[in-house]
Design a protein with these regions (language model features):
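Glycine-/charge-enriched secondary-structure boundary and capping motifs
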Residues: 3-6, 12, 16-25, 130-149, ...
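Acidic/polar, glycine-rich intrinsically disordered N-terminal extensions of enzymes
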Residues: 18-45
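A generic structural signal for residues located within well-ordered alpha-helices
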Residues: 26, 30, 95, 206, ...
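Residue-level detector of flexible, active-site-proximal loop/helix-junction positions
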Residues: 35, 67, 80, 157, ...
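Compositionally biased, low-complexity linear motifs
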Residues: 36-51, 265-278
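Glycine-rich phosphate/pyrophosphate-binding loop regions near the starts of catalytic domains
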Residues: 40-201
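Short, acidic (Asp/Glu-rich) active-site segment that either coordinates a divalent metal cofactor
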Residues: 180-225, 260
């Protein structure tokens, strides 16, 4: 058959062509083979509460035993334009971890235990190469790090819509559970409470429209700064341990909007504010490179990037030092970066 553009007129009967789904760009057999390839990755995440097999119309899971008044907590997110750079540089596994992290880190801010994760992947073809399999393997890794099951997902072939070779779009959905009496909602926060910042793994998954603009203008080469694509750190295990030891009053996942916009979301009422000392930690060098190459104002840097702080806790001053020591014992760097003040 002569190669044609998608919108060229074509009389199938006159040309003697029998149209099928594969000719239109979707190979059902390849899709079934892909499902078989990812089964081991998916099953490696399953918790004892998972019910049923793999590949059904839905996923089922029991609420773990021990909860008296369980409250379900849900969140959804993507990886933004970081996904485009990850595609270009073959970081498919890492972007899978990113996807889980962006959802899980949001869900745990109220004290929830992550239960299960769902993914949505849109790609031109599932059989072009191993990249979509690598992506799912990364998602499974993120789920194992989070302690949640990869309960299901959808991989859709969009041959006419995603014309760039190997490009894909992804979204994730996470559900967790928390005991109603143990919800961390910020209601106990008072002036003088301390803000502890926990190190990020670099840029994480926000600010990439600005970063990509710098790459388009040849000011930054990703090949010179591979740490730009480091996956977002997952804080679920750390937070799970800390909340058993210390009275955590509030938590924030530092994403788009940086510290100035995410920390105030912890505050329970009017009359309170956040005071941050930006000199209290050393920001990773990559942020200095971005600021210098783009001539970005400091205020803009603070509103766009995490600047090296990926997650924050608000604790009473009497447990500040012990909390910092405990975080260090888990292998993370952390600093007291500010406090709660009267507005």
């Amino acid at each position: 058959m002569t190669e044609r553009n998608w919108d060229d007129p074509l009389d199938f009967k006159e040309e003697g062509i029998e149209l099928d789904y594969k000719l239109a760009g979707v190979d059902i057999d390849a899709g079934n083979y892909f499902v078989e390839k990812i089964k081991p990755h998916v099953k490696s995440t399953h918790r004892p509460e998972v019910m049923g097999g793999f590949g059904g119309f839905n996923g089922m899971m029991r609420i773990p035993s021990g909860y008296q008044s369980p409250i379900l907590v849900s969140g959804t997110d993507g990886v933004g334009t970081k996904g485009k750079l990850a595609t270009l540089f073959g970081r498919d596994y890492d972007i899978g971890i990113d996807l889980v992290a962006m959802c899980v880190n949001d869900v745990i801010t109220c004290g929830a235990e992550p239960l299960y994760f769902l993914d949505y992947i849109s790609c031109p073809k599932v059989d072009d190469n191993k990249r979509i399999t690598e992506l799912v393997a990364g998602i499974a890794d993120g789920c194992r790090q989070s302690g949640c099951a990869l309960l299901g997902g959808e991989t859709a072939e969009h041959p006419q819509d995603l014309a760039v070779p190997n490009e894909y779009d992804i979204a994730g959905f996470c559900t967790g559970v928390v005991e109603e009496s143990e919800i961390i909602d910020g209601k106990l926060i008072n002036p003088g409470d301390k803000i502890i910042g926990i190190e990020s793994n670099g840029v994480h998954a926000n600010g990439f429209s600005l970063i990509r603009y710098l790459t388009f203008r040849h000011q930054i080469k990703v090949s010179d700064h591979p740490d730009l694509l480091n996956p977002t750190r997952i804080y679920a295990s750390l937070v799970s341990d800390l909340k058993k030891e210390f009275p955590i009053l509030g938590m924030a996942h530092i994403t788009g909007g940086g510290l100035p916009e995410n920390l105030p979301r912890c505050l329970p009422r009017k009359g309170l504010d956040i005071k941050i000392d930006y000199s209290s930690w050393k920001r990773p060098d990559i942020f200095n490179v971005i600021q210098d190459k783009g001539n970005v104002k400091e205020e803009e840097m603070r509103r766009v990037f995490n600047l090296g702080i990926g997650y924050c806790l608000i604790v009473p001053p009497e447990v500040e030092v012990d909390t910092l020591l405990a975080i260090d014992g888990h292998g993370y760097k952390s600093w007291t970066i500010g406090e709660v003040v009267l507005e």
